[in-house]
């Protein structure tokens, strides 16, 4: 099996995420070659493997200790699969909480599927949380993109 090439990129300026960005925010970007429809990319990308579900479960248990939004692993996965804002060019979902706000974008442009996460930490806990989950976040995002490219080359 050929390993899909997931590129780390500056997210395209056409994204709705850019109007949110301020100094101190986090915004990453990835892309893979694929001309799949966003609805299909969304369905494949957010059908998480068991190791991701386990990480989300640990995250949710940790967040509940601090009284922050956590939901069950399944409800968080459902949130990520719900993409309520958008069209066939871009879909954005997210959540606001006491410690940070986040949005995830899937965008289709020029034969590529792009994925980005925007985060605005509100306090020290939000910044610490972001620093703690970032290594896992990168692996999960790259995995999502690779699974999309494998399913729809």
Q: Positions of the model-derived regions?
A:
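Hydrophobic ligand-binding cavity/cleft-lining segments
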Residues: 1-71
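Hydrophobic-ligand binding "helix-grip"
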Residues: 72-109
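Short acidic, glycine/tyrosine-flanked loop/strand segments centered on an H-E-D-like triad
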Residues: 106-125
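Short, highly charged C-terminal tails/helix-capping segments
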Residues: 149-153
């Amino acid at each position: 099996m050929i390993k899909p090439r997931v590129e780390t990129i500056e997210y395209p300026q056409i994204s709705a995420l850019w109007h949110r960005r301020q100094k101190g925010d986090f915004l990453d970007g990835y892309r893979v070659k694929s001309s799949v429809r966003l609805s299909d990319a969304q369905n494949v990308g957010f059908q998480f493997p068991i190791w991701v579900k386990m990480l989300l479960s640990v995250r949710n248990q940790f967040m509940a200790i601090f009284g922050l939004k956590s939901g069950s692993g399944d409800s968080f996965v459902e949130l990520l699969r719900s993409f309520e804002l958008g069209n066939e060019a871009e879909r954005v979902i997210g959540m606001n909480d006491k410690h940070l706000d986040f949005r995830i974008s899937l965008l289709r442009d020029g034969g590529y599927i792009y994925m980005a996460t925007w985060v605005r930490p509100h306090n020290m806990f939000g910044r610490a949380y972001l620093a703690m989950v970032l290594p896992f976040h990168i692996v999960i995002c790259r995995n999502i993109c690779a699974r999309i490219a494998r399913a729809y080359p």
